[in-house]
Amino acid sequence: MYKILIADDHPLFREAIHNVIADGFPGSEVMETADLDSALGLTQEHDDLDLILLDLNMPGMHGLNGLMNLRNEAPTIPVVIVSAEQDKQVVLQAITYGAVGFITKSSPRAQMTEAIEQILNGNVYLPSDVIRTQKSSPRRSGHEEHGISPELLQALTRKQLLVLERMTKGESNKQIAYNLDIAETTVKAHVSAILRKLKVHNRVQAILSAGDIDFAAYLRR
């Protein structure tokens, strides 16, 4: 079904993720490695990989430098960070450096399965509990730091705000459609309008920009 590489230096965690994939995506081919050099080698041998699940702290990684090296060597293979790290800035930097998702190792099994499914379907997955936390620096609010002014937010309709709020929770278009009781095509239209009105280029930028927004305040208008 899928071809997935797990790159993590902890055997027990590799086994746990392997089991998540085996149960959630039967028939998938799973490869494992415990260091960055081996991961880079496998991407050269298997350029048809559907996904790489990458630990930030395994040998050779040097934090996000390893992610950048992997993206440079295998730019067509989606990479998801799987880490015990829960610092919001690390999550944001990982996405900036080319990861298509970030899964915390403390995530429940069902949440990991859902995250992998979203990513394999072409969506981006971000841990909503981390993204919604306030930054440690009090200098600016999230929407100011990422360029979303109150004026831009006020241009969104109520329904678009509801869709954006769901996006920041890591929901796919299908989930948003179900939760808001609207058609998936309508959700896609709202997402396109949101990107245009917020002057961002993609879904990831919209999610990151909206991470600290108090949606309740805007929805009370």
Swiss-Prot record:
UniProt-listed Gene3D superfamilies: 3.40.50.2300
HTH luxR-type domain sequence ranges: 149-214
Record has Magnesium as a keyword: no
Entry GO MF terms: DNA binding
The encoding gene: agmR
UniProt cross-references to SUPFAM superfamilies, sorted A to Z: C-terminal effector domain of the bipartite response regulators, CheY-like
Domain Response regulatory: 3-120
Key words, A-Z: Activator, DNA-binding, Glycerol metabolism, Phosphoprotein, Transcription, Transcription regulation, Two-component regulatory system
GO biological process: glycerol metabolic process; phosphorelay signal transduction system; regulation of DNA-templated transcription
DNA-binding region: 173-192
Task of the protein: Positive activator for glycerol metabolism.
Organism: Pseudomonas aeruginosa (strain ATCC 15692 / DSM 22644 / CIP 104116 / JCM 14847 / LMG 12228 / 1C / PRS 101 / PAO1)
Modified residues (4-aspartylphosphate): 55
This protein's name: Glycerol metabolism activator
